[in-house]
Amino acid sequence: MGTSTATISTAAWADDHTPRIAILGAGPTGLGAGYRLKELGYKNFQLFDRHEYVGGLAHSFTDAQGFTWDIGGHVMFSHYSYYDRVFDALMGEEYTLNNRESWVRMFDRWVPYPFQNNIRYLPKEAAFECMSGLIKAQNGKGKIASPTLARNFGEFIDAVFGEGIAKHFMRPYNYKVWAYEPEAMNKQWIGERVAVLDVDRALKNVMLGTDDFGWGPNNQFKFPLRGGTGEFYRRFGPALGLGKSGGECHVNLRKRVVSIDLERKVLSFSDGTAEHYDILISTMPLDVLCNSVLRGDVPAGVKSAAAGLKHSSGYMVGIGLRSRAPGAGTPDTKSWMYFPESNCPFYRVTYLSNYSPHMTPDRANYYSLLCETSESPAKPTRGDNGRDTEAMIEETIVGLENAGLLEPGERKNIVSRWCYYADYSYPTPSVERDEILTQVIPFLESHDIYSRGRFGMWKYEVSNTDHTLMQGVECVNRLLLGEPETTIGMTYQITQDGREAAVHERSAQAGSGEKRLSKPAAAQTPVPQTRAANLGVTADGVEVQVPGVARVVVRPRAAGAVLAA
């Protein structure tokens, strides 16, 4: 997959009378959209973010003790040649290349990830439970006869992995990650995120005692040499004119939008200022956009649908320590680790100090652990919705001791305690999510609002930083060049044995390519006329059913037309 990198060499998009494009959010999606607009020579756009920095959830912080922390365990691996080229253009050679070393902590031992391919590391009784359940499931004798019959992620787990693996790892771990039971989630999101099982491979690993470490697209990953993950995204700021004056600057920080007038197309900010737009690319959470920010004739059905989206919050707790001996550095070579058991609050811990020699004040004498804990109405924590981060830090330290990551007495070596609370951490791929998107996204696009990104599109399966950056790029390609948005249209087809293949389709929710800004006739690019799977295609556009609205037709723009300023 990928995207066109063709640019327009003429001044076709430089005219001040072109439609004004506003972008809300300077995370990967917004930055990707802005970067692509500038690359295409389009000048009439502005990007707004409520923070004093760019990067969104991909930002990094350096604390007073000199430790650098990410908002979660980010690594940089890419599905896109375009993303790779942008990374190379902005970062040059200033990155490290790391081999992934992932483990699962359970039964007081370390099991190589993926757990389901390394059952031989378990106690014999648990290993037997896992293999027996797996064989039954793969022969259609488990709780669910086939993955194709599974109605949700919980049933998918039972159908593919069997009772043993479900009991010991898949169910407890996924509850800790998502903060919802697997039955509340759909099965379509899985794709590359979960390693499904080849029963012969699993049996061979058990019988022959072989290890199986190689699954996944991120076996090897890049990481910025300095500044954490956020350094890559920080560099988009200067590329988009941050710090410059006049029309050269396209980035506006400390700008929190409080309302969006649908009819007048006006953004109102908390500082009392307002901005007109013709086209809006929004990356704010979709439920917030529809229920708290939009002003105007928003159907009750759209509001109630968006309110039904689920998400989890998250605590990112950083623990910086002196090394166990002078010059000893990080005590382990592991990259990150998974924790399905209940003796610790976190689901994942990362040795950030292994990613780059500059993540601590002194690589030889300090190391760092980043711990992630989820929270939702279905899974409350001592953190109490971010109101008591000190309680979460203390519980995290106790959990590190319970899990064996901190040795007895090592607590005294802690020199940094950092915590970031993300109210919106994971967009839950709930059972009802896709139906909600089918109701909400077309309504927004009928008003020239393109909701994209991790929480703008609410598709966790395409919410890695490369995916989300490309959502912004592809949205611009759609608007200016008439190209389809392949990332948000990605689906996974589940086969009889539970294996899946990524399929790039024209999305039923958005990205059907039918709507774009018109270019001057000399530079026109034909618009693909592909039928969207679940939408009625009429002579005058794409007809969608939106609760509370009799008929919404998303119409293509006439050749040569531009929106009125």
Language model features with spans:
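A short, basic/flexible loop-to-alpha-helix module at the beginning of a structural domain
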Residues: 2-17
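C-terminal lid/capping helical subdomain adjacent to the catalytic/cofactor pocket in oxidative enzymes
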Residues: 7, 11, 430-565
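N-terminal Rossmann-like FAD-binding beta1-loop-alpha1 element of flavoenzymes
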Residues: 13, 19-47
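Conserved Rossmann-like nucleotide-cofactor binding loop
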Residues: 29, 53, 287
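Glycine-rich FAD pyrophosphate-binding loop
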Residues: 38-62
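Dinucleotide-binding Rossmann-like beta1-alpha1 core, especially the glycine-rich loop
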Residues: 65-145
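Active-site/ligand-binding neighborhood in enzyme catalytic cores
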Residues: 119-120, 126-127, 131-263, 276, ...
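C-terminal segments that line or cap access tunnels to active or ligand-binding sites in enzymes
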Residues: 277-279, 283-450, 457-461, 467-470, ...
